[in-house]
Amino acid sequence: MIHQYKLSGYNIVLDVYSGSVHAVDDVAYDAIALIDQGLSCQDAAAQLEKKYAGRADVTPADISDCFDDIEELTAAGQLFAPDAYADHAFDFKNRSNVVKALCLHVAHTCNLNCSYCFAAQGKFHGEAGLMSFETGKRALDFLVEHSGTRRNLEVDFFGGEPLMNFEVCKQLVAYARSIEKEHNKNFRFTMTTNGIGITDEVIDWCNKECHNVVLSLDGRKEVNDRFRVDLAGNGSYDRIVPKFQKLVKARGGQGYYMRGTFTHHNVDFTKDLFHMADDLGFTELSMEPVVAPPDSPEALTEEDLPKLFDQYELLANDMLRRQKAGKPITFYHYILDLKHGPCIYKRISGCGSGTEYMAVTPWGDLYPCHQFVGDPNYKLGNVWDGVTNTALRDEFKLCNVYARPDCKDCWARLYCAGGCAANALHATGDIHGTYEYGCKVFRKRMECALMMQVAQRLDPELAKNAVKFESDCDGCGDGNDGACEK
């Protein structure tokens, strides 16, 4: 499968199954397109000779050489490569039940009242509650017991607002550290917070114990304060920004992300990203499209898509400009490592929700991920009895890119792994469906990310200043020398 497109002055050809990315001239671009349409090299060459007959810089010999190059790349498996991965997908139901990550809902309550919140202002359409230390401790024991030989274990403190249960977070990390050596585990904690509860103690603790922190900010003050308000309806921007700045400064080079949501009301979301970068000093950025009912005022529309596509292109080109100036920023969805993975297992199966990754409620119930919490049809079990709804777990095991018929002809499927099961469920009623609007956005982001990779390879100045990413994928391994354990 081939995907071709033109962006920012580059002719880009992606060979889907080999993962090869080619930047080519006009002749090669047209030649590959004709072959992909089923023409023989001879017939394609004849068409190109007619098309380029008026150009002195394109001779019949040049066209012949071009087809020789195409044949050479094809023989090397870098063009028109066959799909060698389908067979991997059919064995997924028989894979192990190893769990590698938990999302701990330490608080089903929140000190903000964001109107677009999928979690119903932190209560997940149920009762408010805080996780006890005993429940959290059992969740960590459950993770260790079901992690097999995997060493690296991921735990995200989530809510609601997890800092409303900060004491339990501290106790749980202390407990995890106390059992790491005995079980040969390495816990990596993430704190996701709206910032209201950040104190100097929280900053010191996060910077000591958290592998990553995710800080919720939608960008410009007027954008952020449209939705991210407290229970009295007051905006949160002025209270959280200084705290975020202090935390990030204290983290030094440790991981963090500013995580925003854009809606129909701010499809010019690059202004929010640039505000966070230029005015506030944040360099690690993420901005997610809202997922809302179609009749919601903030829901994105089909009419918004051209504007969003323009925004993604604007962002990619501006990031290249910043790189050349030696002041790069990171955008989460443009992180792409073409050399080091993730492995094909991860590229087929995605996030592992419901199998390798689960969410734990304050009462110890297990769900496939945070977006399923509160739906009784998607309760997997609990941290004491384990996964008791094995049929549901098996259904999620089969939730991969090859299980989605709509993904069959999509060039981006080995980059999205079939997309989000929760979004598919909400859009189609089936976790094996596809959220088509999200697919369109994802494909555009991938085109921009690939274009940036091409630009960095072709421009030494960009390459010198580019932010380097190497995948730390542990999708099927134990973190030791690339050992694979499915």
Named regions from a protein language model:
Residues 1-35:
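Acidic, low-complexity/disordered tracts enriched in E/D and polar residues
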Residues 109-119, 368-371, 405-422, 474-486:
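Local cysteine-cluster metal-coordination motifs and their immediate loop/turn environment
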Residues 140-158, 396, 434-478:
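Short Fe-S-cluster ligation motifs
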